[in-house]
């Protein structure tokens, strides 16, 4: 496929040196296919260092921790280290902060909607920080039964979103 694209001057990021696809948005970058189809291939090996765009390898991260203070209002992060930010600014700031410390790398095999398995390697430094911080706040503010309900509903909600059922009746009921 890479040769076909090159021959027909179709611009793609995949190449002989980067034999995988990537998809990027504000929350994460996903890497799939190509060399990643081999489940025994170590995605985090030094030879694959160039694949990652948002984060350094934990081995290359500073040995000194960097502390971050997040401010939440009605469940949303509104400030990082005392600086008020819009959602875009929060994600950009946390992606940079987490990325320089090797936070947020994930290697997993997914079960797709059609039943096939697919390996994905992800970078989500800002998402990892926000998720962890929000869970800590929830542990302080939610009672046990509400947390149990959350833990039973969140996987189904996430599955519906993952499958593209954003406008399905189930999603509408979850928003009530």
Regions found by a protein language model. Give the residues of each.
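Nucleotide-activated chemistry modules centered on ATP-dependent adenylation/adenylyltransferase
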Residues: 1-175
């Amino acid at each position: 496929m890479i040769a076909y694209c090159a021959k027909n001057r179709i611009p793609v990021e995949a190449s002989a040196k980067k034999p995988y696809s990537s998809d990027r948005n504000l929350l994460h970058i996903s890497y799939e296919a190509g060399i990643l189809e081999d489940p025994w291939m170590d995605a985090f090996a030094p030879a694959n260092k160039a694949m990652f765009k948002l984060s350094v390898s934990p081995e290359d991260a500073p040995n000194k921790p960097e502390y971050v203070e997040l401010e939440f209002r009605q469940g949303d992060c509104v400030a990082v280290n005392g600086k008020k930010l819009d959602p875009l600014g929060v994600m950009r700031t946390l992606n940079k902060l987490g990325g320089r410390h090797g936070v947020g790398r994930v290697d997993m095999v997914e079960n797709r909607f059609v039943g096939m398995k697919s390996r994905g390697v992800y970078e989500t430094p800002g998402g990892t920080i926000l998720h962890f911080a929000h869970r800590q706040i929830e542990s302080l503010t939610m009672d046990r039964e509400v947390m149990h309900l959350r833990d039973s509903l969140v996987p189904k909600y996430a599955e519906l979103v993952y499958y593209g059922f954003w406008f399905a009746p189930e999603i509408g009921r979850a928003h009530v």
